[in-house]
């Protein structure tokens, strides 16, 4: 669909996500979300206050509509531009910034740890905590859901080792 062929009435009736699709299809390039929002607002003649009220709706619609693909760093493209096999490879992921923290040394050198390593440590700590809780439960002598009667066999008297049918 061409932008010039649309009447003002058709543009007003069109949803924001449809307008975003038309803008991206005609420009044939990925857009930053806020740039796309401005293009859609310009196209539909939406005021800035109305645009601020609708920003979350457009973002939600882009996420739900299967025609759009997030490329990382708040950049959106059309899924049809990327073959299925290449889509995962070409999507850019922003580099996570390294976090700085002071080491305990007096020489003032700084250590740099990547965010991934910190997240991995947090998961290991959580895993250790869960293991400790499980061990405590295992060591706990009481089993709330266990009753010695559960082990008794029906029709068998444990005291003399005879079945109840044999007693005469």
Swiss-Prot record:
<keyword id="KW-0240">DNA-directed RNA polymerase</keyword>
<dbReference type="InterPro" id="IPR007759">
    <property type="entry name" value="Asxl_HARE-HTH"/>
</dbReference>
<dbReference type="InterPro" id="IPR029757">
    <property type="entry name" value="RpoE"/>
</dbReference>
<comment type="similarity">
    <text>Belongs to the RpoE family.</text>
</comment>
<comment type="function">
    <text>Participates in both the initiation and recycling phases of transcription. In the presence of the delta subunit, RNAP displays an increased specificity of transcription, a decreased affinity for nucleic acids, and an increased efficiency of RNA synthesis because of enhanced recycling.</text>
</comment>
<feature type="domain" description="HTH HARE-type">
    <location>
        <begin position="14"/>
        <end position="81"/>
    </location>
</feature>
<dbReference type="GO" id="GO:0003899">
    <property type="term" value="F:DNA-directed RNA polymerase activity"/>
</dbReference>
<keyword id="KW-0808">Transferase</keyword>
<keyword id="KW-0548">Nucleotidyltransferase</keyword>
<keyword id="KW-0804">Transcription</keyword>
<dbReference type="GO" id="GO:0000428">
    <property type="term" value="C:DNA-directed RNA polymerase complex"/>
</dbReference>
<dbReference type="InterPro" id="IPR038087">
    <property type="entry name" value="RNAP_delta_N_dom_sf"/>
</dbReference>
<dbReference type="GO" id="GO:0006351">
    <property type="term" value="P:DNA-templated transcription"/>
</dbReference>
<dbReference type="GO" id="GO:0006355">
    <property type="term" value="P:regulation of DNA-templated transcription"/>
</dbReference>
<feature type="region of interest" description="Disordered">
    <location>
        <begin position="87"/>
        <end position="168"/>
    </location>
</feature>
<dbReference type="Pfam" id="PF05066">
    <property type="entry name" value="HARE-HTH"/>
</dbReference>
<protein>
    <recommendedName>
        <fullName>Probable DNA-directed RNA polymerase subunit delta</fullName>
    </recommendedName>
</protein>
<comment type="subunit">
    <text>RNAP is composed of a core of 2 alpha, a beta and a beta' subunits. The core is associated with a delta subunit and one of several sigma factors.</text>
</comment>
<feature type="compositionally biased region" description="Acidic residues">
    <location>
        <begin position="106"/>
        <end position="168"/>
    </location>
</feature>
